[in-house]
């Protein structure tokens, strides 16, 4: 029985839910799912039932999360059309406590889209920080984000790139080298495509793309054009997904590492690349404590099995990767000097994670 060890994973893109959406997930269940999937750090997206946009909402999130988390947690500040007028004050008061600023430049869960040119210009101008501006973009809004980041020399982190034409566009802007542009890809865009009939459980934003796009994403991974893998873990209940208007989003924290290791076995990605995308690069981009996360590790055993829903720790209890064959099982996760997960059980105590 051969064991393998990897440094613990860092997820720059998780939706922990909680608040009025604690039927979908809570900080506790999200971070338990994270630990079971080999993650020691997740960064929470601000599109909560009430968005995290200022000192007050940031404080509420911290109060709610700190007693629950079993991994470390990062926070992003959000900005909505309603909060733009207070941008200067909010950014000044919150910049030190967050890992970056998230802007929804496309319609998605929560409905916090900012699409006025004036608002967007003001946001990019006012965020005078080296910490990245993260963008959810679809179609035309990607050009806008790239142009504004270049205009104000801001560090830009493009979430969930899913298509070949987006990669080409980003490449053009990168050649000018005026600012940092980091690119994230999700496990669902790497491992699923629009040919698979898994709707509504495969409905997310941006939607699953063609096999050609998927291949372009893998090529970009190999060529070094992708910086991180963000799970975009976005749980919704089974009932909601099966309703007449299913919400967009899929869970991903518990399946990403094993899927990547299967891809390694198939010769699609190297072990070094997996570590770069899930550990080294997120630590660098978000300026995290390298020593702490370098010491933490995930132990896996080589064993073929099918991904099953009844073993999941996420509260939503389903996965779009159901019944996919994988080649490794996570047996132990060591985090912060302790065994946090072992053989299906979470041993880490609620509240043991830190907000950083
Ligand atoms: O599919 C998605 N779900 N895409 C997003 O950008 C947001 C997320 C969510 O919060 O449900
Ligand atoms: Zn998004
Ligand atoms: Zn997201």
Region annotations inferred by a language model:
Residues 3-68:
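Metal-associated gating/positioning segment near the N- to mid-region
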Residues 13, 34, 38, 73, ...:
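Divalent metal-coordination and catalytic microenvironments
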Residues 23-31, 82-94:
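Short, acidic/polar
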Residues 38-43, 69-73, 128-132, 148-156, ...:
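Short, surface-exposed connector motifs at secondary-structure boundaries
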Residues 63-79:
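A glycine-rich helix N-cap at a beta->alpha junction
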Residues 85-229:
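Histidine/acidic residue-rich metal-binding segments in metalloenzymes
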Residues 140-143, 148-153, 222-223, 228-230, ...:
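His/Asp/Glu-enriched, well-ordered alpha-helical/loop segment
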Residues 295-356:
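C-terminal cap of metal-dependent C-N hydrolases
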């Amino acid at each position: 029985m051969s064991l393998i060890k990897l440094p613990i994973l860092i997820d720059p893109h998780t939706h922990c839910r909680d608040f009025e959406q604690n039927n979908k997930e809570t900080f506790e269940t999200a971070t338990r799912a994270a630990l079971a999937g080999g993650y020691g750090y997740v960064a929470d997206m601000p599109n909560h039932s009430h968005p995290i946009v200022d000192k007050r909402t940031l404080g509420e999130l911290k109060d709610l999360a700190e007693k629950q988390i079993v991994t470390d947690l990062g926070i992003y500040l959000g900005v909505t059309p309603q909060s733009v007028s207070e941008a200067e004050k909010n950014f000044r008061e919150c910049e030190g406590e967050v890992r970056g600023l998230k802007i929804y430049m496309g319609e998605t869960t929560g409905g916090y889209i900012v699409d006025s040119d004036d608002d967007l210009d003001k946001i990019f101008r006012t965020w005078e920080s080296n910490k990245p501006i993260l963008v959810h973009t679809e179609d035309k809004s990607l050009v806008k984000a790239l142009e504004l980041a270049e205009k104000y020399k801001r560090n830009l982190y493009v979430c969930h790139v899913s298509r070949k034409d987006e990669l080409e566009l980003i490449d053009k802007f990168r050649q000018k080298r005026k600012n940092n542009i980091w690119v994230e890809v999700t496990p669902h865009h790497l491992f699923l495509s629009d040919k698979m009939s898994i709707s509504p459980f495969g409905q997310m934003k941006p939607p699953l793309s063609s096999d050609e796009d998927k291949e372009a994403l893998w090529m970009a991974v190999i060529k070094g054009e992708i910086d991180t893998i963000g799970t975009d873990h976005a749980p919704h209940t089974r009932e909601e997904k099966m309703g007449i208007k299913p919400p967009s989003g899929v869970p991903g924290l518990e399946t990403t590492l094993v899927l990547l290791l299967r891809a390694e076995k198939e010769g699609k990605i190297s072990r070094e690349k997996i570590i770069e995308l899930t550990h080294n690069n997120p630590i660098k981009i978000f300026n995290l404590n390298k020593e702490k996360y370098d010491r933490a590790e995930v132990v896996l055993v080589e064993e073929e099995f099918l991904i099953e829903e009844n073993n999941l720790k996420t509260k939503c209890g389903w996965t779009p990767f159901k019944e996919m064959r994988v080649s490794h099982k996570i047996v132990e996760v060591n985090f912060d000097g302790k065994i946090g997960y072992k053989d299906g059980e979470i041993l880490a105590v609620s509240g043991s994670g830190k907000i950083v």
